[in-house]
Regions:
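N-terminal acidic, glycine/proline-rich low-complexity segments
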Residues: 19-307
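Bacterial Sec-dependent N-terminal signal peptides
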Residues: 1-20
Length: 307
């Protein structure tokens, strides 16, 4: 009887780990350029099952309108259409950051996260990839703490020195909702992994290479080229011609998909937060990551064009 139980457990475990990773992407897509490339990479990743895409606010940007989540949803919907994934839910998140942990309201995004998380478990968790502010995922957990055990959160944010364990929280995503970030860091029950800006900045795409590849992808390619060409960086005077782009968000998505070329370690949280361990990526292989990124997209687009 004991042998049968062990065998059953091993079979269940094998099935779970051979399945695609169920993922919700939470992104501030309209904020920049790299989000678009990250979402395309996630949607074409054979190891992923994208459960839905939600949008997060980026109110600190000088380009921010009165409804940044709506801006991002429009772009997300366009990408889903271009990749023939119209059936994937696309939802809007909170328009403002959390002002107090005692007055949290839900949004379409946080409601969706709660609903989907309840379908998973600790042994078969739902992965939430946060590419912008942490408003939606924090709101979801605060409103229904029971989902914490059913999810893994991957966050793209803040700077971190792995040698000294020094944190610099003066980073765009973190500034857009510092209360939400603190809540995640302080939550001892939450499985949290961070792709720091320090590590992700090493993934850089060159325009000449990117455009030559995108020209093969018809409408999707032209859509991404237009975004690259039309966006003007507000945070730097360097590279005004947009010859290169740091692919912060792509680094996180591809790190999850390619664990053999992305390396993380356990670190104590910042000194002002509840003391616990979180995972932080310390190194990636940008060259291999870039090669695999384009290879899978090319494979998907070729298959799509022949359907």
């Amino acid at each position: 009887m004991a042998f049968i139980k062990i065998l059953s457990f091993l079979l269940i475990t094998q099935i779970i780990f051979s399945q695609k990773i169920p993922i919700i992407i939470d992104a501030d897509t309209a904020n920049e350029v790299d989000d678009l490339f990250a979402i395309v990479g996630a949607l074409t990743e054979p190891k992923f099952d994208i459960v839905g895409i939600t949008t997060s606010q980026f109110h600190t940007s000088p380009y921010a309108t009165n409804n940044t989540p709506l801006e991002s949803k429009i772009i997300n919907d366009n990408i889903l259409s271009l990749l023939n994934y119209k059936s994937i839910p696309s939802l809007m998140g909170h328009n403002l950051p959390i002002s107090s942990l005692d007055s949290i309201t839900n949004s379409e995004a946080s409601d969706f996260i709660i609903k989907k998380a309840k379908l998973f478990s600790k042994i078969n968790p739902l992965t939430i990839i946060v590419l912008g502010s942490c408003t939606n995922i924090a709101s979801a957990i605060i409103n229904d703490p029971s989902i914490t055990k059913n999810i893994k959160v991957y966050y793209l944010g803040f700077f971190h020195d792995p040698e000294t364990n020094y944190y610099n929280l003066n980073e765009f995503n973190t500034r857009n909702d510092p209360i939400a970030v603190d809540f995640l860091l302080n939550n001892k029950d939450l499985d949290l992994t961070v792709m720091s800006a320090t590590t992700s900045k090493n993934l850089v795409f060159k325009r000449s290479v990117v455009f030559s590849k995108l020209m093969e992808f018809d409408e999707l390619g032209f859509y991404l080229i237009k975004r690259w060409n039309s966006y003007k960086r507000w945070w730097t005077e360097l590279d005004k011609e947009n010859k290169k782009w740091t692919m912060w968000d792509v680094a996180l998505v591809e790190a999850i998909a390619n664990q053999d070329i992305s390396f993380k370690d356990l670190f104590d949280t910042p000194v002002l937060n509840t003391r616990r361990k979180i995972n932080i990526y310390t190194k990636i292989n940008p060259n291999v990551m870039t090669e695999r990124y384009w290879k899978k997209i090319n494979f998907y687009m070729n298959r799509l064009n022949h359907e």
